[in-house]
């Protein structure tokens, strides 16, 4: 239910009024300009922004709402066998507790349903269903699946004879109110499927859930032996390297990561939120856009800079080795470093563009940078042109960042399916792999492809063949020194020396110990 002041913004003295004592969002204060439409209102003010008057390619940023991916989706039969085998050993309840996380999107639920072997017809209404509705479709499908313990073959809308399942039967199962065989099991499954659009109540609970999920996903084969010289050799020969990056590649620029002691979530503790991640929750933004803008300046990219690691990615591209960089970062520094748009997938969107939540107008990201630095809510001038009073979120402009509760861009899923068939080396750099669906990419990488982690902290039980621990910039500097590659960045020095410490499990810790004068 919408309430007005304190949940309202008024137009006074030529623009957006400053907040009353009970308002939490801060819009830019205004200065009257020529062309006012009447006493106390104007058509343009500071803090008001006009949408970009031309079309912009925002494939990296906008979300997919049309559900077309269902028509072309092909279930992963190997994954389906693993799922069914796991259910047979551990039970449906354990499976749901393992696979369902608070960060899952609607699309993730659909993919899980289809990879379990259920027909596409069961999720054909995906675009208009809520997250919770899709979760309960999955629940009912599993509860009414008499062949649950037997691996199924791929089900296609035009070929339902493969497993003897009829789409209309599935629909009937979903819509029926028939009694379940076991009320206690049903209740437990309901608890396991208690999916809400909000996140966990605190970060510790969320991380604990993810850790449990990680441990239960050790159903993959043991990684083959792989040594540091093997990586040096593979970097030299590889032509299709997939790189997954996270916040750790930007920390050298002063941009905080999310989960370390000095990370963003720790800094957000002063906001007295039950869950710091709610700052990046879509429903929270619609209720209180000012909350996001109190912290957005912390993750705003610095002007004109990018890290040595970003330059390393550009080097892989220039050497025709980079298949794709899947970044979880929203700072858009990959493109600043020179990565081509076709080589980059911004899994969680970016600050490159912004969008009005009311009229869907698109803006160049730079237009709201000053508002972000001033902790102000930017507002759409078009929406406010003839408006005197509206809900607090009306005309608010949001960066094209994928918030919790939003689907990832369709481009992520389309290219991922294609890239996994070509990849010859898999690098994960600067991420703890805590957020789905990016966290599960490694599980889809073919077994024969070497999987390398470059990160400050280790990630156990995820199938990495080799883990190189240290600052991301230092580790890639060492690798490039071994390869006699020059990284085009001011912080790279061929004369740097490194200390290597071999760990008991065969992984390495790499630390830069000195810097000499460049030749």
Swiss-Prot record:
- Which PROSITE patterns does the annotation name? SIRTUIN
Broad class of the protein's primary localization: nucleus
**How does the cofactor attach, per the note?**
Binds 1 zinc ion per subunit.
Q: Which GO terms describe its biological process?
A: adhesion of symbiont to host; cellular response to oxygen levels; heterochromatin formation; negative regulation of DNA recombination at telomere; phenotypic switching; rDNA heterochromatin formation; regulation of cell differentiation; regulation of fungal-type cell wall biogenesis
Q: Give the enzyme class.
A: transferase
Give the region (Disordered) as residue ranges: 154-212
Q: What induces it?
A: Expression is up-regulated and increases progressively with hyphal development. Expression is inhibited by 2-dodecanol and decreased by allicin and fluconazole.
Describe the reaction catalysed, as an equation.
N(6)-acetyl-L-lysyl-[protein] + NAD(+) + H2O = 2''-O-acetyl-ADP-D-ribose + nicotinamide + L-lysyl-[protein]
Deleted gene: phenotype? Leads to high frequency phenotypic switching, spontaneous hyphal growth, and decreased replicative lifespan. Shows also oxidatively damaged proteins even distribution between mother and daughter cells during division.
Between which residues do disulfide bridges form? none
**Compositional bias per record (Acidic residues), positions renumbered to this chain:** 187-208
Q: Where does Zn(2+) bind?
A: 356, 359, 380, 383
Where in the numbering of this chain does the Deacetylase sirtuin-type domain appear?
221-486
Which keywords, in A-to-Z order, does the entry hold? Metal-binding, NAD, Nucleus, Repressor, Transcription, Transcription regulation, Transferase, Zinc
Binding positions for NAD(+) per the UniProt entry: 246-265, 328-331, 430-432, 455-457, 472
This enzyme's EC code(s) = 2.3.1.286
- Name the catalytic site residues: 348
MF terms (GO), sorted A to Z: histone H4K16 deacetylase activity, NAD-dependent; metal ion binding; NAD+ binding
Q: Which domain of life is it from?
A: Eukaryota
Q: How does it assemble?
A: Interacts with HXK1.
Q: Which family does it belong to?
A: Belongs to the sirtuin family. Class I subfamily.
Protein name per Swiss-Prot or TrEMBL = NAD-dependent histone deacetylase SIR2
Q: Which organism is it from?
A: Candida albicans (strain SC5314 / ATCC MYA-2876)
Upper lineage: Eukaryota, Fungi, Dikarya, Ascomycota, Saccharomycotina
Designated gene of the protein: SIR2
